[in-house]
């Protein structure tokens, strides 16, 4: 294609809406500490930066889109003109969890963080939960999910008492061996907990954590299920639903928004399964929003401080991304981002999420790329971009839809400042 044809295609795409937006959230793949990270005990944490320092990474597709143009990443050379637009965004809301991040992407700012329980849940909460499920519980403390089933798994198998635990995030997690407590019964317990945990104890998520295996080799199974709460205000998925725009959720998306605004959805067993379902959605869904969360980075590697596993998972995603990019049409927009960080660097002993910027990569085959989106003041800028594309608007955020053509230049945010990287 000649240069004039490229320019004509870019101008046309900038003037008309993309028929389809594919939004992929790489759960916990942050890109450096936010200015207020010290308030969360996260000064110096940098998920992508530290994984890149751990060894050379093979990420040719992410680098081609502009990942290494956002921040310097060890062993990764930024292209002079990446194929995509690139930037990073701050989380405006207090907190550093999945719900806060995804809600903000959709235009919901929280005034206060979801409650956390560094010393376990209040005795009255646990007592009422035990009364309603008809059995005692074990644990009730912050813990790594893999470590607590090592510690208490045998006692759970012997007694049948479910293991209740939390973390540095706003979660009430219930672990049970599938041979001792059926998955259906575990889900019922989670539904009871979700109804119980309201008011001042309204945690962001109740999570079912089934596991199996013999003593000494317990392992979590993929039948995890999240029970969230409704977003408190109208948000992107409501706007799209009202406008008749289809929303297809992949992975945890349905659970994170408590089903609000999500039409059809597909759960996933792994990142590879999530990418396979994204491929299927490209074949079957010609328009609307395809919204996915790929959780392995967080669940399998970030919380477990497995920096090598995190590196391999990024490389796996990059390999799968290469073929995916070939399937995109001129009327498609792909956005790749994260919801928070979860730095696996062993120098930080905590296994909790980290308060970090998230990367933004935006790619459309019809656009020239190479656009610096700068540092965005809120994750809601991405949601506002999607909303504007489909003719709507959400309460917060500044759209960068027009910037993607490279013709609009840098704009000032209504609720903060954008600066060049």
Where are the regions a protein language model picked out?
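Feature captures the catalytic ectodomains and active-site-proximal regions of enzymes
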Residues: 2-421
């Amino acid at each position: 294609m000649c240069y004039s044809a490229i320019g004509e295609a870019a101008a046309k795409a900038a003037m008309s809406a993309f028929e389809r937006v594919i939004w992929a959230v790489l759960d916990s793949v942050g890109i450096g500490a936010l200015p207020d990270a010290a308030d969360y005990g996260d000064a110096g944490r940098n998920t992508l930066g530290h994984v890149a320092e751990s060894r050379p990474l093979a990420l040719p597709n992410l680098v081609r889109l502009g990942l290494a143009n956002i921040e310097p990443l060890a062993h990764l050379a930024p292209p002079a003109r990446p194929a995509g637009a690139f930037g990073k965004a701050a989380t405006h809301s207090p907190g550093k969890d999945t719900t806060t991040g995804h809600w903000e992407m959709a235009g919901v700012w929280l005034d206060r963080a979801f409650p956390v329980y560094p010393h376990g849940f209040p005795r009255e909460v646990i007592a009422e939960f035990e009364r309603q499920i008809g059995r005692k519980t074990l644990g009730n403390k912050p813990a790594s999910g893999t470590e607590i089933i090592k510690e208490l798994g045998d006692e759970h198998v012997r007694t049948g008492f479910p293991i209740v635990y939390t973390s540095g995030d706003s979660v009430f997690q219930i672990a049970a061996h599938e041979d001792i407590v059926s998955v259906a019964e575990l889900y019922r317990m989670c539904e009871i907990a979700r109804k119980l945990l309201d008011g001042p104890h309204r945690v962001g998520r109740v999570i079912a954590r089934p596991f199996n295996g013999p003593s000494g080799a317990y392992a979590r199974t993929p039948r995890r299920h999240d029970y969230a709460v409704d977003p408190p205000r109208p948000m992107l998925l409501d706007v799209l639903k009202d406008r008749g725009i289809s929303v297809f959720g992949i992975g945890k998306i349905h659970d994170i928004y408590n089903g609000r605004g999500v039409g059809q959805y597909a759960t996933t067993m792994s990142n590879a399964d999530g990418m396979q379902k994204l491929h299927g959605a490209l074949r079957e869904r010609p328009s609307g929003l395809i919204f996915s969360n790929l959780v392995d980075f967080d669940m399998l590697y970030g919380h477990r401080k497995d920096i090598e596993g995190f590196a391999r998972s990024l490389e796996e995603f990059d390999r799968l991304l290469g073929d995916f990019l070939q399937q995109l049409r001129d009327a498609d927009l792909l956005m790749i981002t994260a919801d928070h960080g979860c730095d696996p660097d062993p120098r930080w002993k905590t296994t909790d999420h980290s308060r970090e910027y998230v990367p933004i990569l935006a790619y459309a085959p019809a656009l020239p790329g190479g656009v610096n989106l700068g540092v965005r003041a809120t994750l809601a800028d991405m949601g506002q971009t999607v909303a504007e594309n489909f003719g709507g608007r959400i309460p917060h955020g500044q759209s960068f839809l027009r910037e993607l053509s490279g013709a609009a230049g840098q704009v000032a945010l209504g609720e903060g400042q954008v600066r060049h990287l």
